[in-house]
Amino acid sequence: MATKVTIQDIANELQLSRNTVSKAINNTGVLADATREKILRKAAEMGYKQFAYLPLFQEDAAKTAESSILPSGKREIAMLTTQFLSSSHFSSMMPDRFQSEIDHLHSYMTIHRISPIELKEKKLPSSLNIQHTAGIICFEVFDYDYAQMLCDLDVPLLFVDTPVMEMRPPLKADRLYMENRIEIQNAVAHMVQRGKKRISFAGDKNHCQSFFERYMAYKDAVEHFGLTEGLSTCAMPSGQQNYPVSLYETIRRFKTMPDAFVCANDFVAMDLVKALDELGYSVPDDIWVCGFDDSQEASYFAPHLTSIHIHGQIMGYTAANLLMTRIEEPSLNYRTVYTETNLILRESTGD
């Protein structure tokens, strides 16, 4: 059995710190582009986690093609992403389950990263051969015009999360989301029940549809409880490359700090906790913080982070079902599916 490649193995190979390698793979923190690219290339070369998926099952596919629902000559299920998927619970477990579900179809899954230039010029990744592609699944594809270009390819297509869709024509594709509203509102209710009155939001609400839905769920909840003063201290810097610094500068200007923050995801929450600490505020003693995703980091971050758990296995199973049924029945009406999430209370909200 092959030895599992770890972040420390990659760090040793490149003579870098484990923390630096983790930042590159998880797309957190600030790194020079050249350093990030070097780490990601080495991760793919060494077969780290999802990077080892390229490609699988090609030999068997040719032998058993007749039993597959896939069109003749099209064996590839292409995963497109604007960045390598992190090792957080959701984005590492979902592709694993997705791949296990498509194995019996005698297909193989490939992962293609959309470069910034390809994104800007609305071009497919150079590594993708569309003539051999039976279907496409998209992660972290949040540019609306690029998403529309993919919809025009006439290839079965599934988006896992999408660009913000408010006041825009719908995408002609199936869409899969995690449930973003219910547990955000439960988190706000929990804070209110424990005496928190000034509750704010942190994160770029326009980053993607899920972030937008989380913000709207937060806003609806504080308005429901009549506690709208927290709306004036939401920390929502947008389009910033150096997000932790932008977040710090945003909250540093607040004349009054909130009692609690609901965050767009765990990495925003962790950046926020660090910024608050630099400003002399303790979490949870002074301010409560809730994340979203329930990433692996959430359970060992200090303080342990209250978060909203995404069921990666269920997301992967549902994604496979949506894409395979689209391949089998291309004329189906487009579907939008949400999967359950759950609030996990931990130390950052005094639990």
Give the ranges of each region predicted by the language model.
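N-terminal helix-turn-helix DNA-binding module of bacterial transcription factors
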Residues: 1-65
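Amphipathic helical "hinge" segments at domain boundaries
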Residues: 2, 48-124
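Short, solvent-exposed amphipathic alpha-helices that sit
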Residues: 89-105, 183-186, 209-229, 271, ...
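Short beta-strand elements in bilobed, periplasmic/extracellular small-molecule ligand-binding domains
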Residues: 102-114, 201, 219-242
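Flexible loop/hinge segments that line or gate small-molecule binding clefts
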Residues: 139-183, 267, 293-305
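Hydrophobic alpha-helical segments within soluble ligand-binding/sensing domains
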Residues: 174-202, 241-249, 269, 310-328
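An alpha-beta-alpha
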Residues: 185-227, 335-350
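Flexible loop/turn connectors
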Residues: 248-351
